[in-house]
UniProtKB/Swiss-Prot annotation:
It catalyses: Hydrolysis of terminal, non-reducing beta-D-glucosyl residues with release of beta-D-glucose. This is Beta-glucosidase 19. PROSITE patterns: ER_TARGET, GLYCOSYL_HYDROL_F1_2. Glycans are attached at N183, N462, N495. A motif (Prevents secretion from ER) lies at residues 524-527. It is an enzyme of class 3 (hydrolase). The keyword Iron does not apply. Belongs to the glycosyl hydrolase 1 family. Gene3D superfamilies: Glycosidases. The lineage of its organism: Eukaryota, Viridiplantae, Streptophyta, Embryophyta, Tracheophyta. It comes from Arabidopsis thaliana (Mouse-ear cress). Residues 1-21 form the signal peptide. A beta-D-glucoside binds at Q52, H155, N200, E201, Y345, E418, W469, E476, W477, F485.
């Protein structure tokens, strides 16, 4: 049964157990969903990334990144936009931290820009003192306002000099350079920051950048649908596996350095993965298809950091195109995360692909799967999707994904490192009566927070934090500024003015500290 977003009367009635089960989180008993419904100490925050918000690309000796070069070289692939100014977080972070306070959040996920610290990619070629100080000032301001930082070391902004020298993550030479940079950040900020992420979305970084050519550096083979004609270089079905392999080896070495860092004692480190959930389209053999695509989407990077090697299904399918880890690398990779970061947005139907051309390999042909937000004949859509939405809304997928990770990966600590609703308002983008009344985003957050609460309180999944994407509208990669994900609206034509959306008002109420729900009331929202 499909439930329309608009005109929906949403009734959220939540009954949690006040007593501890044999294992798992303890949830207070509440009648309505609020901050009070989550376990004691549960953190709520917002998330951003350096390239998407900072701007100031030519200040403080910052060097160019992969994405700076890409947006200038291929403007038609990013809506003719760039992030030279972005939302000017570099100069306005104090103002934006007050927006976080207004939301009643107590966490903030940020990323450090590698070329803002090492303009040319390596320490020996120079350190930007201003860049280093910027992150000190930002972290200090967060802590002064009782907001806990979660810091991502790499969020796709490879220094351009390393791209030019040896192809960035296409070369194993990236490993020592990344580890040097990561180790520098650990020792520089480790006494203030206790929560770290080495890499953001390795699946997206490798597949979108090096297999389908959708994101920087925009590499793919000519036979790839949609972007094949745009890609000037690349080798789909080969390069994404090389990139991820180097990334995983770099992660293991960086974690080894982190665990030896005296300043970092008591800290935690992980990777932010970006799996969707998948429902089987065909009943016969459907679950096998789902299991296979999950191996290729999340197991690709989570299996090595948990068990020390790639999923067997990937090794069988990809064969010699999938690099092999040495025994020493496997030993370092195994149990190399303290938590599993999850960026969840949407879900798909998965269907076995029987029409694979092995002469033109890609990640998708190796996975032997097709996935879409609707069935092949279009008769059934997964969840619901308003006309302006970037992705289908399917909160059940979040709960199912949490349970899957708990069961397959030995019940790890999980942090929701991103979750949010994106929309393209088209010609209504500057119509504030539309843009600020983002009821669909409010609905999305309500449904997903309810699903997350059920995963924690009923399924006993060990989720400890939730970070909303995003604090504010920003540069959304290939979509430029046309896709809005923020709970604060950015007026890109009027001094980057920040404006509160309806979702921000709702979230602020939801997160009010000490809020106790009325015993006789339930939450009704006219959407």
């Amino acid at each position: 049964m499909k439930i329309p977003l608009l005109g929906l009367l949403l009734l959220i009635s939540l009954v949690g157990s006040p007593t501890r089960a044999e294992e798992g989180p303890v949830c207070p008993k509440t009648e309505t969903l609020s901050r009070a419904s989550f376990p004691e100490g549960f953190m709520f925050g917002t998330a951003t990334a350096a390239f998407q918000v900072e701007g100031a690309v030519n200040e403080g000796c910052r060097g160019p990144s992969l994405w700076d070069i890409y947006t200038k070289k291929f403007p038609h692939r990013v809506k003719n936009h760039n992030a030279d100014e972005a939302v000017d977080f570099y100069h306005r972070y104090k103002e934006d931290i007050q927006l976080m306070k207004k939301l009643n959040t107590d966490g903030f996920r940020l990323s450090i820009s590698w070329p803002r610290i090492f303009p040319h990619g390596r320490m020996e070629k120079g350190i930007s003192k201003e860049g280093v100080q910027f992150y000190h000032d930002l972290i200090d301001e967060l802590l002064k306002n009782d907001i806990t930082p979660l810091v991502t070391v790499f969020h796709w902004d490879t220094p351009a000099d390393l791209e030019d020298e040896y192809g960035g993550f296409l070369s194993e030479r990236i490993v020592p350079d990344f580890v040097e940079y990561a180790n520098f950040t650990f020792h520089e900020y480790g006494d203030k920051v206790k929560n770290w992420i080495t890499f953001n979305e390795p699946w997206v970084f490798s597949r979108s950048g090096y297999d389908v050519g959708k994101k920087a550096p925009g590499r793919c083979s000519p036979y790839v649908k949609e972007f094949g004609k745009l890609c000037q270089d690349g080798r789909s079905g080969f390069e994404p596996y090389v990139v991820s392999h180097n990334l995983l080896v770099g992660h293991a070495e960086a974690v080894d350095a982190f665990r030896k860092c005296e300043k970092c004692k008591g800290g935690k480190i992980g990777i932010a993965h970006s799996p969707a959930w998948f429902e089987p389209e065909d009943v016969e053999g459907g679950q096998a298809t789902v299991n296979r695509v999950l191996d290729f989407v999340i197991g690709w990077h989570l299996d090595p950091t948990t068990f020390g090697d790639y999923p067997q299904s990937m090794k069988d399918a990809v064969g010699s195109r999938l690099p092999r880890f040495t025994k020493a690398q496997k030993a370092k990779l195994k149990d190399s995360t303290d938590f599993v970061g999850i960026n969840y947005y949407t879900s798909f139907f998965a269907k076995a692909d029987q029409k694979v051309d092995s002469r033109n390999p890609t990640w998708a042909t190796d996975a032997l799967v097709e996935f879409e937000p609707k069935t092949v004949d279009g008769s059934i859509k997964i969840g619901s999707q308003p006309n302006t939405a970037k992705m289908a809304v399917y909160a059940k997928g979040l709960r199912k994904l949490m349970k899957y990770i708990k069961d397959r990966y030995n019940s790890p600590e999980i942090i929701i490192t991103e979750n949010g609703y994106g929309e393209d308002l088209g010609d209504k983008d500057t119509d504030l009566s539309v843009a600020l009344n983002d009821h669909n985003r409010k609905y999305y957050l309500q449904r997903h927070l309810l699903a997350l609460n059920e995963a924690i309180c009923e399924d006993k999944v060990n989720v400890t934090s939730y970070f909303l994407w995003s604090l504010m509208d920003n540069f959304e990669w290939q979509d430029g500024y046309t896709a809005r994900f923020g709970v604060y609206y950015i007026d890109f034509k009027n001094n980057l003015t920040r404006m509160e959306k309806e979702s921000a008002k709702w979230l602020s109420e939801f997160l009010k500290p000490g809020l106790k729900p009325s015993k006789s009331s339930k939450l009704h929202e006219e959407l």
